[in-house]
Design a protein with these regions (language model features):
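Long, contiguous binding/interaction regions
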Residues: 1-181
Length: 181
């Protein structure tokens, strides 16, 4: 069984950069703030569906202090001259009436300098592996239609994808049944 709270894996990005994908920890708060401050307005808009400049203490605590039962959060890190730096993050939050829950909402963010290197896809695969073991059968996401990069991550995931457009959003359903192609 996967120990999500202590999850850690090494990956190589498309450009050859080595990264660590690991469970987020409460002590990641400052590094997460730095990563969020490194996002441009468009990325913040796509991730949070509006202009977002500041994050409340409650939002930061919710982002870094997760239960690893219903909420799983992973960060992608590199080593730089000052130590570990967060360059991406992803999470899912389980919902639904089943016990244990079998549906989850999934979301990601990646620093601009690292877009297009496959980080979100790698986080998605790691989250999916944990989710499947916990009985999650579908990921759901709401994506702004202009966020072509995120839609491409889902479409290239290897999992069956269903897209529905309504109320100005793309509603994505990703079936985790079976293995990704």
């Amino acid at each position: 069984m996967i120990d999500a709270r202590n999850y850690k894996a090494q990956e190589t990005l498309k450009n050859g950069l080595q990264v660590t994908i690991r469970a987020i920890r409460p002590e990641d708060r400052e590094a997460l703030i730095a990563a969020l401050k490194g996002l441009d307005e468009r990325t913040l808009y796509y991730r949070f569906f509006g202009a977002k400049q500041d994050f409340s203490a409650q939002e930061l605590t919710a982002a870094t202090d997760v239960d690893f039962v219903r909420t799983i959060a992973l960060v992608t890190c590199i080593q730089d001259g000052e130590g570990e730096k967060i360059i991406g993050a992803g999470r899912y939050i389980a919902f639904g009436n089943a016990e244990p829950p079998d549906l989850a909402e999934v979301a990601f963010m990646v620093e601009e300098d690292y877009h297009g290197l496959g980080i979100a896809g790698k986080i998605l695969r790691h989250l999916a592996g944990i989710a499947k073991e916990k009985g999650i059968r579908e990921f759901h996401a709401e994506v702004l239609p202009g966020n072509k990069g995120m839609l491409a991550v889902f479409n290239k995931s290897g999992f069956p994808v269903k897209l529905e457009y309504a109320e100005g959003l793309a509603h994505v359903t990703l079936s985790l049944a079976g293995d990704a192609e």
